Regions:
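Asp-based phosphoryl-transfer active-site loop
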Residues: 286-303
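Canonical Radical SAM [4Fe-4S] cluster-binding loop centered on the CxxxCxxC motif
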Residues: 2-43, 231
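Core AdoMet radical
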Residues: 6, 26-39, 55-71, 81-101, ...
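Accessory C-terminal segments flanking Radical SAM cores
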Residues: 184-283
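Conserved acidic, metal-coordinating active-site core of Asp-based
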Residues: 394-476
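Active-site phosphate-binding/coordination module
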Residues: 106-107, 304-414
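Substrate-recognition element of Asp-dependent hydrolases with the DxDx(T/V) motif
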Residues: 94-96, 149, 314-338, 412-429, ...
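Conserved C-terminal portion of the radical SAM core fold
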Residues: 60, 128-207
Length: 476
């Protein structure tokens, strides 16, 4: 069962801050309004407990208009939910103005699971100094609480936000949201300055076309039970509290995902790679190296080149020191053609399902290559190293003798004259059966049957050396 990401926003509209740009600044709420918010929240928490078994694994984040964590019932509810075995993470957006001592006591008394708590801490320069805010973040991190910090990218606040970055530990990510209502584009200097603070800021500047197909298993629930796919998608039929509730399919009426709560919650591989299983918590992951497929990952069906947002994300990973490698069934020339706009960001890769390995040396010690594998290693040119697993010409001759009866086209791939892959390709939508794979195995010479591997990929049958695979390529 797929994991679910649920956002909750109750009726709370009051805040203890008075930021000049915020409509909820010092918004007064009556005792009756506060009690309604409390009752709605506790009702929602109880309903999550009752539905947890049906929902399966999930994460919950509170995204209030006002400040939630100055009210004890939010701490109590989050702690309650954190004890559910199906709840993998619980979090909230906050200005970090709550009392750490009092809140920690509430959490402990409610037996909350601290390792599941996630905080999205927003810095408001008008209300708190960078040093004070950084101190609160640092102390929370030292308590073992996972968090991110961030601010709205107001150009006039650049120096203060830069100071906050210097005050924060390196391991706490400081994000920058593009400013709504700026009424002009950011200057080149401003983009560079904000990107130096938040390497992912470039993602805020690219419009992401809406696509509800990327928004499965996410839901935005209001205090009265009304639902949306995300905070901007528009209302969907039904209500969270209806008796015949089932997790709804995504509905979207927008043309673009215009904020992080919208584009950050999509099921895109980029979001998961950068920010983990539940990217809406905005806590980055860091890798020394990543291996990425081309078809279905870097390029979706129908795409002719890698989209600007994906390209920008890859540039950020490269800048942060992550080594990028391809892991694809495509041969090198085809991969280079299809990924021309990002090719230089990659340090090589695993091509032709592992039959052709190519990489730039980076001074690190590579794993020991298997001694019992047929291989050829040589410099492709000065900056690359290469391993090629050759395929015997007798295999090609045997396949050529029979392939026409399978109603397909045959492509043989060579590097410097050496055969390393055969692809049998049918028209789109026509797959391959296991019996056809056995038929091809039977036509091989007896002395070559153990040296070949067949791999069915949609409308293609790949014929490669037995020692070649993406998994082995990663190990090498």
């Amino acid at each position: 069962m797929d994991s679910k990401m649920i956002l909750y926003r109750g009726s709370l509209k009051s805040c203890n801050y008075s930021c000049s740009y915020c409509p909820f600044a010092k918004h007064p709420s009556s005792a009756r309004e506060m009690e309604k918010d409390r009752m709605d929240w506790m009702k929602f928490c109880k309903s999550l407990e009752e539905r947890a078994e049906d929902l399966g694994r999930f994460a919950l984040m509170v995204v209030p208009y006002g400040e939630a964590l100055i009210h004890p019932w939010y701490w109590e509810g989050l702690a309650f939910l954190s004890r559910l075995k199906q709840a993998e993470a619980v979090g909230v957006q906050t200005n970090f103005s709550f009392s750490a001592g009092q809140s920690g006591k509430l959490w402990r008394e409610a037996k909350g699971r601290k390792e599941k708590l996630r905080l999205w801490a927003t810095y408001h320069p008008e209300m708190v100094s960078p040093a004070r805010f950084a101190k609160e973040c640092r102390e929370a991190a030292e308590e073992g609480i996972a968090l991110c910090a961030g601010a709205v990218g107001v150009p006039e606040n650049l120096s203060l936000i830069g100071e906050l970055r210097r005050c924060l530990p390196d391991e706490i990510y400081l994000w920058i949201n593009a400013m709504d209502g700026l009424k002009r584009a950011y200057t080149r200097e401003e983009v560079q300055a904000f990107s130096a603070i938040d390497p992912f800021f470039i993602r805020e500047l690219s419009a992401v076309p809406a696509n509800f197909k990327n928004c499965r298993n996410r839901l935005f629930v209001e205090g009265n039970g009304k639902m949306q796919t995300c905070n901007i998608s528009g209302r969907m039929p039904g209500n969270w509290y209806q008796e015949d509730f089932s997790f709804p399919s995504a509905v979207c009426r927008q043309k673009a995902c215009s904020c992080y709560l919208a584009y950050g919650g999509r099921g895109d591989w980029v979001n998961t790679l950068l920010f983990g299983k539940y990217p809406l918590f905005r806590i980055p992951r860091y890798f020394p190296a990543v291996f990425l497929d081309i078809d279905g990952t870097l390029l979706q069906e129908g795409e002719r080149e890698i989209d600007p947002l994906t390209a920008a994300s890859l540039k950020v990973l490269k800048k942060m020191g992550t080594r990028l490698f391809f892991a694809t069934s495509l041969p090198v020339p085809e991969a280079k053609k299809r990924c021309a706009n990002v090719w230089e960001l990659f340090d090589g890769g695993i091509f032709a399902v592992g039959a052709h390995l190519l990489w730039k040396e980076a001074g690190q010690k590579h794993g020991q290559m298997p001694r019992n594998k047929i291989r050829q290693k040589e410099a492709l040119h000065q900056e690359y190293q290469e391993i090629l697993y050759p395929l015997d010409e007798a295999v090609l001759s045997a396949v050529k003798a029979r392939y026409k009866s399978l109603h397909c086209r045959l492509y043989a791939y060579r590097n410097k004259g050496k055969l390393y892959k055969i692809t049998l390709c049918r028209r789109e939508g026509c797959g391959w059966e296991r019996a056809e794979e056995r038929f091809l195995q039977d036509v091989l010479p007896e002395t070559r049957k153990g040296s070949v591997r067949f791999l069915r990929e949609e409308n293609c049958m790949q014929v490669i050396p037995a020692g070649a695979s993406k998994e082995n390529g990663v190990k090498i």
